[in-house]
Amino acid sequence: MSRNAPNGCVPPSQATAPPSPATSLRLTVGEPVSEPATESGERVLQDGFWEHGRFYGSWKPGKYLFPIDKEELNRLDVFHKYFLVARDEKVTSTPLRKDGRPKIMDLGTGTGIWAYNVVEEYAKDAEIMAVDLNQIQPALIPRGVTTKQFDIEEPSWDPLLRDCELIHMRLLYGSIRDDKWPHVYRKAFEHLAPGIGYIEQLEIDWMPRWENEDLPRHSALQEWAQLFQRAMHRYHRSVTVSGEATRRRMEAAGFTDFSETTIRCYVNPWSPDRHQRECARWFNLAFSLGLEAMSMMPMIDKLGMTKDDIVDLCSRAKKEMCILRYRAYCTL
């Protein structure tokens, strides 16, 4: 698909991802091979299983409820591009040192694209540990970056980097058990450099709101968000975002000097503002690519829905997202 789709929206049958803005990251799903990487640097996934038409990781099954196939990795890279556009091309808002070799951890790194972006364009001498439950990062990585397969719900973080100037987390709601968040923040606090360390977390509230009073009579997007929240709540891995609750948890872990920024993630480019339209195009693409991936395991396992029901719901939600008079947005 071209960068600018018709009306800036993604037809449900044509949702494909553009090239990633930094390192090209791709996943090849195939039979096990003796070497972990191909000549092109693509990683061949060896451990996992197919379910509901998608490929899932098999290390600690049930902890990460979303697929790790090529389509999903493309979606994660598109979301990275959206975050860059929405935040004025800033890969982080943390004031990192330009001299020396700052230590950074990226928790829930996914494809690793954020970590690679930091070391290639922002802090070239940084030492970065990119941590994830799944080994879905490419075999060829920039100098200064190491990848680590690790479950951050584990009691001990001894294998992880210490004295960090920044610990970065993004889109981890739904991946961490509700009762484990205090532990995650406490361990993050312990692994930051005293007096100079920062934690930075970005989450999206998927429940749509509307800019005006022109609302769909029966919103498929709202129905999807309600069902998704309900299913994830039954896993005790909530995706309901509360800045106040997050702040209380961080304060209890020892953090101080908070800064919170809210950005509206418009689902289509209705705005006359050029930057808002560009943001909306990328968010529409990323959201459209992810609807079914986010839905299949939770809604089938916890709500008893069928795959056909979910495909129909997601298709209706995608179509609604492309109607420009419905000025819906999520919040970042």
UniProtKB/Swiss-Prot annotation:
It catalyses: L-methionyl-[protein] + S-adenosyl-L-methionine = S-methyl-L-methionyl-[protein] + S-adenosyl-L-homocysteine. It comes from the Eukaryota. Its EC number is 2.1.1.-. The keyword Transcription applies. It holds the Pfam family Methyltransf_23. Its main location: nucleus. Coiled coil: none annotated. Keywords: Methyltransferase, Nucleus, S-adenosyl-L-methionine, Sporulation, Transcription, Transcription regulation, Transferase. One of its GO terms (cellular component) is nucleus. It is found in: Nucleus. It is an enzyme of class 2 (transferase). Belongs to the methyltransferase superfamily. LaeA methyltransferase family. Component of the heterotrimeric velvet complex composed of LAE1, VEL1 and VEL2; VEL1 acting as a bridging protein between LAE1 and VEL2. Interacts with VEL1. This is Secondary metabolism regulator LAE1. The gene is LAE1.
